[in-house]
Swiss-Prot record:
<comment type="similarity">
    <text>Belongs to the delta endotoxin family.</text>
</comment>
<dbReference type="GO" id="GO:0090729">
    <property type="term" value="F:toxin activity"/>
</dbReference>
<dbReference type="InterPro" id="IPR048645">
    <property type="entry name" value="Cry1Ac-like_dom-VII"/>
</dbReference>
<dbReference type="Pfam" id="PF17997">
    <property type="entry name" value="Cry1Ac_D5"/>
</dbReference>
<dbReference type="InterPro" id="IPR001178">
    <property type="entry name" value="Pest_cryst_dom_II"/>
</dbReference>
<dbReference type="InterPro" id="IPR041587">
    <property type="entry name" value="Cry_V"/>
</dbReference>
<dbReference type="Pfam" id="PF21463">
    <property type="entry name" value="Cry1Ac_dom-VII"/>
</dbReference>
<dbReference type="GO" id="GO:0030435">
    <property type="term" value="P:sporulation resulting in formation of a cellular spore"/>
</dbReference>
<keyword id="KW-0843">Virulence</keyword>
<keyword id="KW-0800">Toxin</keyword>
<dbReference type="Pfam" id="PF00555">
    <property type="entry name" value="Endotoxin_M"/>
</dbReference>
<dbReference type="InterPro" id="IPR005639">
    <property type="entry name" value="Pest_crys_dom_I"/>
</dbReference>
<dbReference type="Pfam" id="PF03945">
    <property type="entry name" value="Endotoxin_N"/>
</dbReference>
<dbReference type="Pfam" id="PF03944">
    <property type="entry name" value="Endotoxin_C"/>
</dbReference>
<keyword id="KW-0749">Sporulation</keyword>
<dbReference type="GO" id="GO:0001907">
    <property type="term" value="P:symbiont-mediated killing of host cell"/>
</dbReference>
<dbReference type="InterPro" id="IPR008979">
    <property type="entry name" value="Galactose-bd-like_sf"/>
</dbReference>
Amino acid sequence: MNRNNPNEYEIIDAPYCGCPSDDDVRYPLASDPNAAFQNMNYKEYLQTYDGDYTGSLINPNLSINPRDVLQTGINIVGRILGFLGVPFAGQLVTFYTFLLNQLWPTNDNAVWEAFMAQIEELIDQKISAQVVRNALDDLTGLHDYYEEYLAALEEWLERPNGARANLVTQRFENLHTAFVTRMPSFGTGPGSQRDAVALLTVYAQAANLHLLLLKDAEIYGARWGLQQGQINLYFNAQQERTRIYTNHCVETYNRGLEDVRGTNTESWLNYHRFRREMTLMAMDLVALFPFYNVRQYPNGANPQLTREIYTDPIVYNPPANQGICRRWGNNPYNTFSELENAFIRPPHLFERLNRLTISRNRYTAPTTNSFLDYWSGHTLQSQHANNPTTYETSYGQITSNTRLFNTTNGARAIDSRARNFGNLYANLYGVSSLNIFPTGVMSEITNAANTCRQDLTTTEELPLENNNFNLLSHVTFLRFNTTQGGPLATLGFVPTYVWTREDVDFTNTITADRITQLPWVKASEIGGGTTVVKGPGFTGGDILRRTDGGAVGTIRANVNAPLTQQYRIRLRYASTTSFVVNLFVNNSAAGFTLPSTMAQNGSLTYESFNTLEVTHTIRFSQSDTTLRLNIFPSISGQEVYVDKLEIVPINPTREAEEDLEDAKKAVASLFTRTRDGLQVNVTDYQVDQAANLVSCLSDEQYGHDKKMLLEAVRAAKRLSRERNLLQDPDFNEINSTEENGWKASNGVTISEGGPFFKGRALQLASARENYPTYIYQKVDASTLKPYTRYKLDGFVQSSQDLEIDLIHHHKVHLVKNVPDNLVSDTYSDGSCSGINRCEEQHQVDVQLDAEDHPKDCCEAAQTHEFSSYIHTGDLNASVDQGIWVVLQVRTTDGYATLGNLELVEVGPLSGESLEREQRDNAKWNEEVGRKRAETDRIYQDAKQAINHLFVDYQDQQLSPEVGMADIIDAQNLIASISDVYSDAVLQIPGINYEMYTELSNRLQQASYLYTSRNVVQNGDFNSGLDSWNATTDTAVQQDGNMHFLVLSHWDAQVSQQFRVQPNCKYVLRVTAKKVGNGDGYVTIQDGAHHRETLTFNACDYDVNGTHVNDNSYITKELVFYPKTEHMWVEVSETEGTFYIDSIEFIETQE
């Protein structure tokens, strides 16, 4: 087929390459479709799946008007609207050919240059010459790449084979890459940003071509040989580019409006023209971008552009004054805001005009007999969509001299005559005659036919599209009367025509063969408290808004399909809060919950809106039907915006086929080409969701397919478990005795049987003050490979302040704040299995498909699926270098529900990544070596100190001379060891954990022996005054690890009674210090009144007449042979302050 020959029709060859024959299509059950599967295993079955083979091309006559860029923009939008009404694959090549011939009619960039010149004139700003050259060069390149792609696509469609598929895939990727690299030249790159407004049309048209291209991967990718993962990447790129392109166009359009805003009539005219022409050239196109989503609109849709277009006011306004006749644009008496308020209506429901009644009045010029009958006012009769009720609106001065125009069948163009009538004393701006096509004529009545006049036609500003583009929907009016410069009076009666697209379905017809769009601005009525607000620029029209519960509005529709047909409902909306809605279809209601989509007081951007499909099905009971939307309960102070309803027809047979196709795609995309392993980018969550899709297949229709797919997906699950380096991924045992299993705090629970996880899920409660909620696990180094990338995958249902850490010789930190926006309206299917996962899976998939996957880490923190990567180094055998997986919530209002956790090997590092890791690893090893040397020194000192505590090598007997001070000295040495924990709060071991643990255990043994041999209970005061009898003016204080008794008054006293072995040798050892005057006493006494006292005073710090530091503790001891079993120890002082670190009374050998 020749793309450039509009009279040539395409002939499709008979099907081949495994496609079904005509007999198979006509008699689908004539032979057993399962026979071929009887002796297959799942790998052989999956190899038979190559995707969808669908394609039929239509070549309509092409219409090109390269001289009028406004006409070009209108033609493109009109053709796209028609294209979107049918399944995408049907006419792609001819459709692309039309677009390229519109934009490059003569293989040069004349149309694109005209796009730029058009806006340059409107905003009175020239684009930089270098920017123009760069843009035109890039456009030429894009055109050439597109031509090459279309040639390859057409050749492949005519006779597909592997070589042609490879060629078209290569050219597709080349064209996609070309768009990505060249789009910055059209207003977003650093060199062109200053000219973004003047480049807006170029940007929008180029973005449109790019988005149309990306959808081809979804239509043809499987047939080209792309893996499902690759197709998903292109799909995600399409969704992300739709967001980027839409937001740029809206922001640039609004900035352009602000740039041309002024204060007078001339500035308002420029503002008005910019608004109109950019709507036709760019913003209408932007509103169609979402409809290129093949997954959401596989069989076409009927997008509706409900926005209004205002042509220029009908007033005498030639390029220059003519004699005494003055052009209206130069007048100083109409302000910008006055004109905007008079000519531009507030947002309102969509309407059609039934009747226009024009009133006429006669104006006679002062001092003469010259007169003119002019349009002084009018009355409009209109009605809302599919609503029989009519209402009237009047403007200007209503008189008995009227001319009636019946516009029920539409008014598509108007020729008008504007006059500036009068003389030096007074003049009038008015309209004297008009011709409404095809409705009728209002003839001119005047006796001064040769006075200043200007004939205006709406088709100059609003070109027709195949004579079927626009309908007159309203007429606004400006009436003014002013006296300026003495007796000169100026009167003005100025109408402005308002237009809507004729292809907007005024009867809201619902069909069974495509998705029906029902914009809420086409409601027949709205509830009290609902307001119509200006659309955000990308919805194609205005939208509805509510700030409290109640009725949103009612849409009246006509069902042009069998009443047995079932449908699903989608609602496109934006909201600052989660809320519940009821959709009433006639008298039956369906309720569902909608999550919030935007922050309070946030602006309405593309990503603020969400399209949610409700799993409940509906059926219309009559052809004339109503759909009423209610919000409850109260949402006071919040904002809800509703854009449109989508009515999605259900074809059971087709949906069953699509379900099988989706299941095949999902399962096939899990495996590598050989079907022996999982693809690296496949997650455990995706395996579970593929299993759900397979489980939902019909046993009757696809029994053998289902059996094979179940076998395959079970194999995938086994492979997923085998590659998962985490132990116990199902959380069967937490805090078990296994060394490397899950360790968790309080507040971690396991849930099972929920709607969002096929397996078990983790729930982390909020932290308690300084105690985080956590769960962690160590992956042993023996299971890891050096210089390899590993990935932690998971799925978060919802979370706030969830911290996910991967710790190796460095830490990778991720915070997830995932909104609770996965709405589940699922219910039990009546079986013992509980949840209806078929319905649940469909709904969750729709929501996840709509979820952005941005590269920005702040935005990525909100996605439900997550991946976190970490690299291993050389796995130094001298250091335990496993990978710690840590999940924790450290805030008191945080929480998390997540599951499908897996740590998998991605592959060996190479190139720059390997070099960077080797450099980082070398630095880390060097730092570890330095720390190890310092730690070894401390370790040896601490080990020697602990050795001195014992008299044997088995640490079973404490040296008699050892006191608490010796134990504390050793403890301080151990405490100075660094890098004991990677995370001190969770006590995750660090590189020095083992030696620290070794020394700490020995010290603990020494402390135990010390406590055991001391017959004085709590002699180190670590338990305060437990076991002691004390007066109220005594206390135990703490300094670091030391606890000490403090007596600060002469009458303070502390004592204790204990038992001993009579007539054995004991040593009383006291470590204390005396501060100030007086003495401190520690006295020991038995039941025979035999007593000994250790005295502490200032003289203790005089050594050979030299005073030493009196802040140090001194140890004194004495030997005592008790005569009785009962003993007493007493502590007192005479004045000053007495500090006692420890009191020991220990039995010793003779």
